[in-house]
Amino acid sequence: MQATAALETDSDKNYPKNGGHFQNDKLYNPKKENMFFSNGCNGVILAFPDGKEDSLATEERASDKENSIVDQRDLSELSFSENQDSNRGNIFSQSSEFEDSNDYAFLNETYSIHYSESKLKDENLLHLYSGLHPEVHKRVEMIFDTLDNNSIGLGRSAEASGADCGDVQKSDVDEDSQQEYHSAELECISAHLAKTVSRSSLDVSELKTSSYDFKCGGNFEDNHGKLESGPSPSLESLNGFAQECSLQVSTSQSSDMLQEYHEPKYEKCKEQEVDLTYHKAFDGILQRSSSPLNHQKVPETQVYTKEVKSQTTESKDFYGNRIFQNKALQRPENATMFPQDRALETHLKANDAHQPSGPCALDDSVISLCGSSQYKSLPEPGFFSPVIPRVAVTDYQAEVEGSCLHHVQGSATNKACSLMKEVCLTSVPDAAACIAAVQQTLHVSSRVNASSSIVSASSITETKMVRQSQAEEWQSDKRSVACNTAWSCGQQCRDAQRAAPGSDSGRPLSTGCLKPSGNSLNENSLELRKVFDTTDRQKHCNRAFQLCEEKAVPSRCCQKTTERAIKAEMHLLDVCYQMCHRHCHHIYKLVMESRAGLNRNLQTDSAKKELGAALLSVLEDLKLRYMNLKGKVHKGIPLEELPPLSVESKLLSAFSDFVSRLMKDEACSLSGANSELDNQSLPDVDVSPGLLKTLSQMSFIPDSSQPEQGKSPMSDVCKNGDTDIGFNCLKLNDKECKTVQEASEDWFDATERLIGADFSETQDSTAECEEWQPRNPLELKNSELHGKGQGFLIHVGGLCPSVSEADLRSHFQKYQVSEISIYDSTNYRYASLAFAKNSNAKMAVKEMNGVKINGKSVTVRLVKIPGEYTPPPLSTTGNSTSMNHLEKNTNKDATSASSICRLPRAKSRQLESEQDSEFPPLDQGVKKNCNQMKSGQLLPETPFQFIPPNTLNLRSFTKIMKRLAELHPDISRDHIIEALQEVRINHKGFLNGLSINTIVKMASSFLRNSALK
């Protein structure tokens, strides 16, 4: 058993209480410090069996029989006496003043040590100083206290030092509060572990002024306690451990012994330099503790915390030639058991305050909620090197890595070493207590007179439950060590988890939040700590959260795959948007340009504006939905889960409304194409059944405009009111035709044949005419209504392509033109002009007919004068779209006889006269013109006598079915339809020309005959 201790005295100067932070100023002289440390003691056990007595037991880990001897060349009176049988050893050494001021810095768990270069005095020791000043003028007394193996109590410090510590005791709390605090902090360790380890006591003491006594084992009123141990990697861990846990034991006996032994030598050690002696002794400790030959069992120490007292335990922990003044405050009821891989996390968490240089202090919460702690030392390297290995801590093992150590301040030749530490916490399952194995000298609190303390079971249970809940979170934490940088990447991001359960802020324990009742810590120390914390956290914030970010971020491969998928979906969405956009433009183009199939005359101005507005509305809605889908795809929503991008429904609704309205508005439009046939030839176009089907589906308005020149001659023939060929069946579905069809129960004109239309002629109707003759009452009605709105129309044909609406308006300006519409076809161009007064229209026809417009003469004719004709008794074709006004011409002039308006009628009359003798003879002039038309192959050779079955009147069919169902209620609908089919077959395949009553009778007869069979 070997132990070394250093006594620090300073009778002239006072050390400032700055919350554990030393200031290298006038109030602090680092050269006047005495350290109390252990050289051969590897572990300490705080044992309080049966509550009888508080004791601090230490077990010697080093098993070397040879003890390191400090070189006497630089230490005049330094000597190490090691004796396992003796209880005390004294060494006195004299060292010279160092060249550079001894500053220290605690930078992210890394101690920077200043020392001057010199030769290594002893190859068996690890010297942290490379050189010492040759002049040694200070004397330091080193005391080795080798305590008995059975245990020596250290609990009577307050009574022995009462006389000399009067001033100090006034600033602290009273004895009662200290005893209560001490009794709550300590607990008996298990008897099993107490038997396996030897006990020794390593205390830190400091005399600040001439009137001070030794305060051993824990809380020093002047906050100048010193903590030190053999294994160098464990010193830093021990510092934090002592700060957080404040191991409270009774130190009266040890205090008495130390006081009796050291009081005679107090005055001698006033002005002695402690740094050199300390580091010489520390080298020996480092060598023994890290020697490969020492493989002793690590002792365990039971640590409990319950209540923080008003006095702050300030321990001066030194590493190398740096002395760290630490305030150790305890958190109530924090006795817990840690897994072995939790201690480093807890220890590193508290020391996240990194100072770049100068005096600094360890954080007060070095080990938050500490329980069982085991400190392992680093193995000694084979040969001395200024580079001391650092520790890379994993879950259950420490890995030695090379690292360089440097000092922050000092001479340029100084070599620095930074020795990292490793803390491995192991949980000791004990129902009564939590035991921590500590391989270093533990700082124990002074000013405590209690003999023993018992930690309540509730405190232990509560803390255990808290730690068990956090075990899963800390299980996988791995840490790496970099030179002069942070120990743990996840250190700062785990602050909240490692905070005490009672901490309202959730962060590690600090002096600010652990103030005992009635007392407060030094405000300067708190402010200084805050400054250091802020500076270091800003500097290392990126590294602190690096581990957490790496765990949360998926692999690079997954990221690339996701990006490619999103990119592909965005491309597909863009394609859909472009297709919909083009589709809208295509529909717009069809409506604007492809008017021949719809037989409509699109007004250039108003129609285009309305259609353009509808198109813009559809495109705007399309773009809005496209942007919404694009944003969702960017958020990671699969495209297949989103609604498709389509504009069909909205597009159709917008354009269908527009088209239907446009068709009604254009009912007044003109078909002046036939007026230009005087010196022109019509194209030879046959009647197409597909066109008939299209016309039947379009439900034409009777007043719809005449198509352009290229329209089928069928429509031209149908414009004759005397040539009814039954096309009214195409518009029987129209609501406007109900009044016409309700007048008769006949199916079509049942008293006549379908192709044998009634040609009841009058002298007026058969007279030669210039224009078309609308015979349908609906046509007349709509024409009159339209005439009231738009006035009277004239047809201007033969326009050249260069004629514009402005040209026509300028030529017809004096006639007060209300509206102008220009229509184009493949080979013909014409215009329709509306006038408010009939007189203006007639005057325009007379004056402007034959006038040249842009170099080409035009033909002008009046097309509508309502009320100048009477309708025939029968309805004419529903496809007749002419609104032309009848101009009676009694002159049988050849030119008049050859008018285009009589060509279809004459041709129809000729065909009918050849087939049926019922027709009266026609005028010779008309026949001549018809023969000319026939020879020119202008009209088809066959009459229009075929009507497809699907064009039958659905309303008449409904009536027939209703009557047959009433007459034959027991017969199904299918049989009734079969009967109608038989009637149609028997009537040469047509029901046209038969009345509804006749059809019903014939179908009923067939059904009765079928029933009889």
Curated annotation (Swiss-Prot):
Transmembrane segments: none annotated. One of its GO terms (cellular component) is intercellular bridge. Disruption phenotype: No visible phenotype. Null male mice produce an increased number of sperm and show enhanced fertility. It comes from the Eukaryota. Residues 78-94 have a biased composition (Polar residues). Residues 792-865 form the RRM domain. SUPFAM superfamilies: RNA-binding domain, RBD. It is found in: Cytoplasm. Highly expressed in testis. Also expressed in other tissues at lower level. Residues 1-25, 56-94, 905-925 are annotated as: Disordered. Keywords: Cytoplasm, Phosphoprotein, RNA-binding. The modification Phosphoserine is found at residues 365, 368, 510, 681, 688. Residues 56-76 have a biased composition (Basic and acidic residues). It holds the Pfam family RRM_1. The keyword Cytoplasm applies. Homodimer. Interacts with TEX14. Component of intercellular bridges during meiosis. Intercellular bridges are evolutionarily conserved structures that connect differentiating germ cells. Not required for fertility. This is RNA-binding protein 44. It comes from Mus musculus. The gene is Rbm44.
